[in-house]
C-alpha cells in the first residue's frame, strides 16, 4: 500500500530538488518509515537505463520525527545524461527486508520504480515557450487568387469554391489521394499578418511548404523548392521579414524520414528530369532508399508505398539534409525560418536529431527545435530503443499530446485530479526548460477539431456521417462554453499555447480531411476570437504566465484550480467544468484578488475566498503577494 508520508518523489520533504536534475548535481533523499516498524537501514537501489549499471546508496538514520525515523542520503547524479529507475530497500535488525516503490510496500512482485531524469543543461531559446504559437495548414488559410496547377507534380486540381468540403471519398482504386487544393499561399499568410498580430501570435508553425504532389505536402518532392502553388523562396523570405517586423517568428515542418514516390529523389513516374532511385541503381539517390528487390519493393513509411522511407544513416542523405553548408536545415534558417518541427521524431535516429540541433546552433544560435512525440518524451521507446529527446543536445521541446488528451477528458466530465496527475508526471520527468517549452495545443491537423470534440455527444461510426456532421445549436453552445475554458487553461498553463488555425473562429470537423477546411474569413465567431486574443494579451502582459512556478491548489471532481507565481505576482486559474454551480472556499493567504476576465474583485476572509462558480465557467485571479 502506498504511503506518501514515507516517501513522495514530488515532495521536497522527501526529494530535493523536484523533478529532473542536471548531470553531476546533488539530489537529497529523505525516507520516513514508522519507527515502530523497526527498520534500521535504508538503501536506495537505482538502475541506469543506458549503461545498465546498478547503483546502491545507503541512507543514514538522521533523526526521529515524532513516530517516524528519517533516513537521509545525498546522491550525485551521473555525469552523463541518464534515466535512473530507483526504489528503496529497508532492512530490519533481524535481517528481514521490505521494498518501497511507487506502488508502496512490496514483499515480492515486480518493482514499480520511480524515475529520475538526468539531463545535460543546455541553452533553450525562451521565445518559443514564452510566446503564442499559431499553426497554419498553408493550403487552407488564405487564398489571394486562384492558382493554376498545370504542369506541377501530381495530378492536382483546385476548388473554385473556398467553402467546399475537402475530398474524402476514395477514388476507384480505393485511395484518397489528397490532390484537391484550395489555393492558400504564403502571400496569403503575409496578407493576414496584422490579423495574426492582433490575435497575439508570436510564432507561426507552418505545415510543410515544399514542393509536393499532395495538399498536405508531407510527401516532399523537392526540399529546396517552395511548392509553386504556395509561392516562391522570395515569397517565403518576405513572409519572414514582414513577420519579424511584427514580432512573429516562423517555424517550418521538417519531414525527413520519408519522401514522396513522385519526388525528384525517387522519381517513380519520371516527372523530374534527373534520374531517381526508382529509375536506376546508378541514381545519386539510390543509396537513400532500401530496396528488396529494386525497383518495386522498398521500405516505406508505415507501408504506404507513396511514401518511400529514407535511410537516415546514409552519409549522402545526412550531408544533404544537415551537414552541407547549404543543407536543407541550414538553407531555410538562412532564408528566415527561426526553427524546425521534426515530423515523426520517433522515426529519426537520436544522432540524426542531435546533428540537426548542432547544425541549427551553428547557423542560427537562437533557433528552436521541436519534435512530434505523442507520449511522455522521456520514457518513449521506439523501435526497441529508449529515446533521448530531452536529455540534452536533441529537442528543445515536444508537442504535448498528453495535455490535450487529459484536458478533453476533464472538460467532458472527468476528474480534475486525473488532469493534474498527467501533467504533474510530465513536470516531474521533463527538464524544467523543456516543460516550459512544450507545445500545448487543443488541436492539430492530425486531430479532430476541438469544438466538435467538446460539443458532440459521440463520434459517428460511419465516415459519411462524420463528413455530414454538424453540431446542433445546443451542442455547439456547450462546445463553445467548454472551448472557452479549454483556452483559459491553455493560455495560463506552463508551455507555449498553440492555436490550430480556425479553432479560435469556432471551426468544426472530425478527423482529416474534415479538420482541414478553408479558414472562414468574415464568418468567424468573433466573441470566441476576442476571447483568444484577450488571453494572449494576458500572457504577454504577465511574465508570470510565461515562466512562473506552477502550484496546484484544487483538483477534485469538476473543479480545477492552479496558480502561477513569479517575483511576488500570483495568477490563479479557477475552472468549474460541471453542468451545475459549484461552491467552495478557496485557500487564499494573500491580498484581495481581481478576476482579469470580468474585473470582479474578491476579498479573502480568514485566508480564504468564498467562491460560487457557475456551470462551465472560469476565473483568472490576479494579485501581488506581500
Segments predicted by a language model, with ranges:
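Glycan-association/targeting regions that enable binding to alpha-glucans and other polysaccharides
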Residues: 1-134
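C-terminal accessory region downstream of the catalytic core in glycan-modifying enzymes
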Residues: 521-542, 585-606, 615-617
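Substrate-binding/active-site clefts of carbohydrate-active enzymes
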Residues: 137-202, 209-335, 356-362, 379
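Carbohydrate-binding surface patches
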Residues: 16, 28, 553-587
Amino acid at each position: 500500500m502506498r504511503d506518501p508520508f514515507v516517501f513522495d518523489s514530488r515532495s521536497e520533504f522527501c526529494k530535493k530538488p523536484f523533478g529532473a536534475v542536471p548531470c553531476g548535481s546533488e539530489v537529497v533523499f529523505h525516507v520516513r518509515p514508522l519507527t515502530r516498524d523497526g527498520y534500521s537501514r535504508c538503501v536506495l537501489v537505482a538502475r541506469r537505463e543506458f549503461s545498465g549499471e546498478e547503483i546502491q546508496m545507503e541512507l543514514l538514520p538522521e533523526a526521529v520525527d515524532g513516530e517516524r525515523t528519517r533516513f537521509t542520503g545525498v546522491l550525485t547524479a551521473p555525469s552523463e545524461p541518464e534515466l535512473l529507475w530507483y526504489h528503496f530497500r529497508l532492512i530490519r535488525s533481524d535481517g528481514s527486508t521490505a521494498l518501497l516503490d511507487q506502488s508502496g510496500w512490496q514483499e515480492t512482485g515486480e518493482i514499480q520504480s520511480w524515475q529520475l531524469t538526468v539531463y545535460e543543461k543546455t541553452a533553450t531559446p525562451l521565445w518559443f515557450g514564452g510566446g503564442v504559437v499559431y499553426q497554419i495548414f498553408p493550403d487552407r488559410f488564405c487564398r489571394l487568387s486562384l492558382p493554376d496547377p498545370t504542369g506541377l507534380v501530381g495530378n492536382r486540381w483546385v476548388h473554385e469554391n473556398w467553402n467546399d468540403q475537402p475530398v474524402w471519398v476514395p477514388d476507384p482504386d480505393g485511395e484518397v489521394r489528397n490532390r484537391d487544393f484550395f489555393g492558400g499561399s504564403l502571400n496569403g499568410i503575409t496578407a493576414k499578418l496584422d490579423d495574426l498580430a492582433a490575435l497575439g501570435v508570436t510564432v507561426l508553425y507552418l505545415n510543410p511548404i515544399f514542393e509536393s504532389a499532395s495538399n498536405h505536402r508531407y510527401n516532399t518532392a523537392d526540399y529546396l523548392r517552395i511548392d509553386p502553388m504556395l509561392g516562391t523562396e522570395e515569397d517565403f523570405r518576405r513572409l519572414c521579414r514582414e513577420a519579424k517586423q511584427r514580432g512573429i517568428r516562423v517555424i517550418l515542418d521538417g519531414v525527413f524520414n520519408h519522401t514522396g514516390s513522385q519526388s525528384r529523389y525517387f522519381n517513380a513516374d519520371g516527372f523530374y528530369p534527373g534520374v531517381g532511385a526508382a529509375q536506376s541503381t546508378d541514381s545519386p539517390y539510390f543509396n537513400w532508399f532500401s530496396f528488396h528487390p529494386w525497383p518495386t519493393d522498398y521500405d516505406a513509411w508505415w507501408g504506404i508505398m507513396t511514401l518511400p522511407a529514407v535511410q537516415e544513416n546514409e552519409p549522402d542523405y545526412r550531408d544533404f539534409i544537415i551537414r552541407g553548408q547549404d543543407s536543407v536545415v541550414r538553407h531555410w534558417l538562412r532564408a528566415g525560418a527561426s526553427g524546425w518541427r521534426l515530423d515523426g521524431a520517433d522515426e529519426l535516429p537520436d544522432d540524426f536529431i542531435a546533428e540537426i540541433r548542432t547544425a541549427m546552433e551553428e547557423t542560427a544560435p537562437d533557433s528552436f527545435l521541436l519534435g512530434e512525440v505523442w507520449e511522455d518524451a522521456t520514457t518513449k521507446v521506439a523501435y526497441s530503443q529508449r529515446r533521448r529527446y530531452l536529455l540534452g543536445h536533441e529537442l528543445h521541446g515536444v508537442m504535448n499530446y498528453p495535455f490535450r488528451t487529459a484536458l478533453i477528458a476533464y472538460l467532458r466530465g472527468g476528474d480534475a485530479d486525473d488532469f493534474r496527475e498527467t501533467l504533474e508526471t510530465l513536470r516531474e520527468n521533463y527538464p524544467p526548460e523543456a516543460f516550459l517549452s512544450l507545445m500545448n495545443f487543443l488541436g492539430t491537423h492530425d486531430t479532430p477539431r476541438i469544438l466538435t470534440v467538446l460539443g458532440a455527444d459521440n463520434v459517428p461510426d460511419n465516415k459519411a456521417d462524420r463528413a455530414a456532421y454538424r453540431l446542433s445549436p445546443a451542442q455547439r453552445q456547450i462546445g463553445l462554453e467548454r472551448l472557452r475554458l479549454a483556452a483559459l487553461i491553455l493560455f495560463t498553463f506552463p508551455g507555449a499555447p498553440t492555436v490550430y488555425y480556425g479553432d479560435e473562429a469556432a471551426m468544426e470537423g472530425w478527423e482529416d480531411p474534415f479538420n482541414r477546411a478553408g479558414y472562414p474569413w468574415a464568418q468567424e465567431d468573433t466573441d470566441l476570437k476576442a476571447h483568444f486574443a484577450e488571453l494572449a494579451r494576458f500572457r504577454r502582459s504577465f511574465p508570470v504566465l510565461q515562466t512562473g512556478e506552477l502550484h496546484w491548489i484544487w483538483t477534485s471532481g469538476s473543479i480545477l484550480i492552479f496558480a502561477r507565481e513569479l517575483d511576488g505576482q500570483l495568477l490563479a486559474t479557477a475552472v468549474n467544468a460541471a453542468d451545475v454551480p459549484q461552491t467552495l472556499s478557496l485557500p487564499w493567504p494573500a491580498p484581495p484578488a481581481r478576476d482579469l476576465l470580468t474585473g470582479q474583485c474578491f476579498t479573502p476572509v480568514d485566508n480564504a475566498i468564498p467562491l460560487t462558480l457557475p456551470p462551465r465557467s472560469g476565473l483568472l485571479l490576479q494579485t501581488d503577494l506581500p
